[in-house]
Amino acid sequence: MAEAGAGFLEQLKSCIVWSWTYLWTVWFFLVLFLVYILRVPLRINDNLSTVSMFLNTLTPKFYVALTGTSSLISGLILIFEWWYFRKYGTSFIEQVSVSHLRPLLGGVDNNSSNNSNSSNGDSDSNRQSVSECKVWRNPLNLFRGAEYNRYTWVTGREPLTYYDMNLSAQDHQTFFTCDSDHLRPADAIMQKAWRERNPQARISAAHEALEINEIRSRVEVPLIASSTIWEIKLLPKCATAYILLAEEEATTIAEAEKLFKQALKAGDGCYRRSQQLQHHGSQYEAQHRRDTNVLVYIKRRLAMCARRLGRTREAVKMMRDLMKEFPLLSMFNIHENLLEALLELQAYADVQAVLAKYDDISLPKSATICYTAALLKARAVSDKFSPEAASRRGLSTAEMNAVEAIHRAVEFNPHVPKYLLEMKSLILPPEHILKRGDSEAIAYAFFHLAHWKRVEGALNLLHCTWEGTFRMIPYPLEKGHLFYPYPICTETADRELLPSFHEVSVYPKKELPFFILFTAGLCSFTAMLALLTHQFPELMGVFAKAFLSTLFAPLNFVMEKVESILPSSLWHQLTRI
């Protein structure tokens, strides 16, 4: 009985809410009926005639001034709306109407009704959004001295932003320094060098750190109580100084490789010494962790130098050995370097083996993983794929798998196809990328465009199918298909990472709000009316009268019908009651 009573109350409440929703129409017709009934006591006809007489006495200059003023106001509103939309990404009028006027008019936010039921889901999605907007180190980043600086010398443009370089400085301080650096003079100098903003000051500090190691220190060794001798001992080389010089001072890849080889000798010695002492305390453990990062970084960059110089097989071997020796250091994403090198060798079976290990649901995805998987599946069918034949006979199983892989990759990063299909021009990739963002798309396409071109028909298949992804995810910011909803923070972060001369790709495309379009149309229309009224006042007057008579013709027709239906003495009968 209690449940039945509660159900009846809910139905009654819903009926009342429904009736209140449409009650304003009843009020509107009631007001119209009362105005018609009270037209004689209120002297509506006399007032209308007075208004029409006043309007007839107005000169065309008044209408010109009126339309000009309204055009000016509409233009000011348009400028303000456009500025607000460019800055905040939404319409001011729309935001005010939704946020303030809608509650006053009885509108209810859908999110508030589901707030208590979806708090856990909201927190999970917020955490996912934060993780997806994290900036990552670009595993395929270029060399500053040998590549980025050469671009600046040729074009006069800076390919790296201050924000990107500042993130690199923070990475260097994290990987290459520790709390005990003050105990070794060279490391203390390098600790300051990584914080230095001026490139020349950093290079000078690296040379200073190497010069300190050239100074021979005398170590007193007592042999007998009556005499002593002096032993000459060389201090260990500073590996991080060689790293900085290889990255920023070397103007060619060959010079950078020589410096990295010197850094490898110094870094390997420091790593072996700290490995033996790592269990003697937290200080030695921190030193060993730092030396491990230095050694891995040097070996990875040496492999990249070999790849740049055309020794691809040697680079693949170095990367495989590095991944076996340090399997837990996933922060460098060495497998992405390995995938690119294997694609250059056209070792597609080895590429598939690497993907089978790293394209796992528990591991963070990347454009390299998703698009490489799509490339392998497209390779099996792309040479014989034809859109006309596929539309007649349908897609085969292999073609369907390839299309699904492309849709998966495009959903993860929708910016990549424009660069692979050369619809947008490429620039040098930044040192940091935002996953699923334009920066990641540039970094991927910069190195992998040649691999897609090498596979016959792969770009044709991509061109025919990539836009179909967007039909599956009509609202990508709210709900995804195979991945989480597309993060809304990518545009802001990419503008910080990419240089100003590059036009950042935005997804999904922001459409101009209705109020901006309406204001623009109103501004243009009133300005045109003001100009025409000023040039042709008599003709515009005739046109205005004809327009108003046509506009009010249906209302006059309805009023005549109402007068013919209702008796003329109805008002007197109502007053008698």
Swiss-Prot record:
Annotated transmembrane regions: 15-35, 62-82, 512-532, 539-559
GO cellular component: membrane
Cystine pairs: none
Topological type in the membrane: Multi-pass membrane protein
Highest taxon, organism lineage: Eukaryota
CDD domains cross-referenced by the UniProt entry: ST7
Pfam families: ST7
Residue ranges of coiled coil: none
Glycosylation sites recorded in the entry for this protein: 47
Record's keyword terms, sorted: Glycoprotein, Membrane, Phosphoprotein, Transmembrane, Transmembrane helix
UniProt family annotation: Belongs to the ST7 family.
The name this protein goes by in its record: Suppressor of tumorigenicity 7 protein
